[in-house]
């Protein structure tokens, strides 16, 4: 009997330890983020522009688990969501505008739980205010 209990605990640990759990006010989306739904994208922008970095999926929320960025000069960095090629329709701020200076950066989130939540079907874009290099990455899931 102890062997069976041990096997159940080992199986539960293996399953639950291989991804992240999310709790959300959106009951249909609360639960487990399987590793197969996790992805990442590079942030590599050198102009004052709005750049799509995550394409939304109809019927799926996007959970941003972490992002990091470092600036090569002074400029603002902001995450927004919306639809269209540059999130131009229904544009909504996910973050405030981070005012970065040369060689300054930031890290948000641990990568194992949602730091930011994007409603179903919306794209995620980066808005930069100056023609300076902004480099980093963003980790997300669309379960």
Where are these regions (language model features)?
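Sec-dependent, cleavable N-terminal signal peptides
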Residues: 1-28
